From Swiss-Prot:
Identification of the protein by name: NADH-quinone oxidoreductase subunit I
Catalytic activity: a quinone + NADH + 5 H(+)(in) = a quinol + NAD(+) + 4 H(+)(out)
Family in the record: Belongs to the complex I 23 kDa subunit family.
Keyword Acetylation: no
UniProtKB keywords: 4Fe-4S, Cell inner membrane, Cell membrane, Iron, Iron-sulfur, Membrane, Metal-binding, NAD, Quinone, Repeat, Translocase, Ubiquinone
One of the GO BP terms on file: aerobic respiration
Membrane topology: Peripheral membrane protein
PANTHER family: NADH DEHYDROGENASE [UBIQUINONE] IRON-SULFUR PROTEIN 8, MITOCHONDRIAL (PTHR10849:SF20), NADH DEHYDROGENASE UBIQUINONE IRON-SULFUR PROTEIN 8, MITOCHONDRIAL (PTHR10849)
Source organism (scientific name): Paramagnetospirillum magneticum (strain ATCC 700264 / AMB-1)
Residues making up the signal peptide according to the UniProt record: none
Top EC category: translocase
GO cellular component: plasma membrane
Function: NDH-1 shuttles electrons from NADH, via FMN and iron-sulfur (Fe-S) centers, to quinones in the respiratory chain. The immediate electron acceptor for the enzyme in this species is believed to be ubiquinone. Couples the redox reaction to proton translocation (for every two electrons transferred, four hydrogen ions are translocated across the cytoplasmic membrane), and thus conserves the redox energy in a proton gradient.
Amino acid sequence: MSFLDRTARAFLLTELVQGLALTLRYMFKPKVTINYPYEKGPLSVRFRGEHALRRYPNGEERCIACKLCEAICPAQAITIEPEPRDDGSRRARRYDLDMTKCIYCGLCQEACPVDAIVEGPNFEYATETRAELMYNKSKLLANGDRWEAELAFRIAADAPYR
């Protein structure tokens, strides 16, 4: 760039004019901002939010205490204590999930052979204390009961990719 070009750019402020033109161009385009608490954007069927434990249609919990989710969790956020039953099967006596450790990777959901643990569509679960983010089995089952219709739809929509 020659001396004359640099001088012309400095005095004519061409970069400034280009920036102002860009600003004016976007000023009159429609806004893309979502007013969050009042408007919510669409979520993918693969969105990974708050965890839930699902039940079978007859009301029995799905978790067979195989501990695959506990083994695969990279953050070690899941703790399961199995309890044997009279018929030889087993269920989880204790199923604890530390949401402060969870990294929402979805590996627990992928590892579960019976689709017991799933990550649902809820992303609004702020709490006032840290202790409220330690989910036990009853809290996870309550989440599953509350979101069952949505969870079943998401699992069915994602089935071709599993």
